[in-house]
Amino acid sequence: MNSAHNKNETTFQRSMKSRHLFMLSLGGVIGTGLFLSSGYTIQQAGPAGTILAYLVGAGIVYLVMLCLGELSVAMPVTGAFHTYAAKYIGPGTGFTVAWLYWLTWTVALGSEFTAAGLLMQRWFPHTSVWMWSAVFALFIFLLNAFSVKFFAESEFWFSSIKVLAIVLFILLGGSAMFGIIPIKGGEAAPMLSNFTAEGGLFPNGFVPILMTMLSVNFAFSGTELIGIAAGESVDPDKTIPKAIKTTVWRLSLFFVGTIFVLSGLIPIQDAGVIKSPFVAVFDRVGVPYAADIMNFVILTAILSAANSGLYASSRMLWSLSKEKTLHPTFAKLTSKGTPFNALVFSMIGGILSLLSSVFAPDTVYVVLVSISGFAVVVVWMGIAASQFMFRKRYIEAGNKVTDLKYRTPLYPFVPIAAFLLCLASVVGIAFDPNQRIALYCGVPFMAICYAIYYVKNRKSQPAADMTHSK
């Protein structure tokens, strides 16, 4: 199995550097949720509660990324955690993880193309949403189809715009909070008064904080893209650890800093009803054309997430095909090293998702969105379990841990803690009426994936043959 991978990996272009991996991960994580939904989160959990939830979420994702780092450096293959799960947990689990992750991103593609079309109507009110959706879908497809280097460079600049907007927001908003720069209209600097007003730091108690933690895990989804890109990165033993370290701490800074400034400048009773809290803050500090600037930033955020999503979903199909669990046509690469057939199929999936949001928004689309939200945490659990089993079998095979170029620290505590914390998030979904449907849809979908795999492969070689140590 390893030899097959190594033979094929030479056909992929190892073009991604550490800066590309870092921005690819940011591109998948920082989406419209931070720019549009953060005010609602603050209203539900309170200022301190939201910050606490994001800090805990960052801790969980850091544990998961430590596990992914060891796996990705030891086995830098395109497909990443699908391949690891198939090898170290079981082929049925690998198959299920791959389809869960593919569905997550293809569902996101549909909603992102629709949202991009709606945003363009601010500047072109008499044009069709669907025209813009088609234009952006073609644009994203071409970025991915041309070459890996072209994709990585475009994602770097997409993500750079988002990061610049967040950094400016934190600097300008923080300065206005503490009176360093004036607030429009001569209003006094609020300092930290909004943190203690309207019920204090935790105005709604601790239960809403727990519910916020569940959604915060989903907010951090996308960091695992670093693992998928391992097979196409330069010097993965150096670039992956560096990308993981910078991604997690900077994401934590961006998320927590944003929530801190929003909480300081927008009273909690207003936070949940403001359409775009970023626009509200930029407007208060006197930034001209704040609404248009943020419309552009959110548009790039959407296109960045779509760009990352099409990349991730196509690589999952390629990996499934290389593992002989999907038709071999999806493993074919162009002369530039891109899986064109997998890209086309993933784009079709995104378009079907878009159509379901139009023609069956309360049935098919709700089910798809629910499964995709549930899938992220399940994939993280798979990463933690894979690393636990990898290290165990690595040692059993007589290898030395010191020979690993990147080692997950505090083994086995880190993978066990990551797995249990993710499991707690999944269990917690059952107690939130708004998210419970994710379990009702996600668990049956997993069962169907397992059933399909074992029906198709009941005559294939035993799973034990696929779990030999590296």
UniProtKB/Swiss-Prot annotation:
This protein's record includes keyword Transmembrane: yes
Single GO cellular component term: plasma membrane
Keyword Cytoplasm: no
Predominant localisation class: membrane
A single MF term (Gene Ontology): amino acid transmembrane transporter activity
Gene Ontology terms describing biological process: amino acid transmembrane transport
Bilayer topology term: Multi-pass membrane protein
Keywords: Amino-acid transport, Cell membrane, Membrane, Transmembrane, Transmembrane helix, Transport
Domain of life: Bacteria
Transmembrane segments: 22-42, 48-68, 89-109, 128-148, 163-183, 200-220, 254-274, 285-305, 340-360, 364-384, 411-431, 437-457
Subcellular location: Cell membrane
InterPro entries xrefs: AA-permease/SLC12A_dom (IPR004841), Amino_acid_permease_CS (IPR004840)
Family: Belongs to the amino acid-polyamine-organocation (APC) superfamily.
Alphabetical list of PANTHER family matching this protein: GABA PERMEASE, GAMMA-AMINOBUTYRIC ACID PERMEASE
Full protein name: Uncharacterized amino acid permease YbgF
Organism: Bacillus subtilis (strain 168)
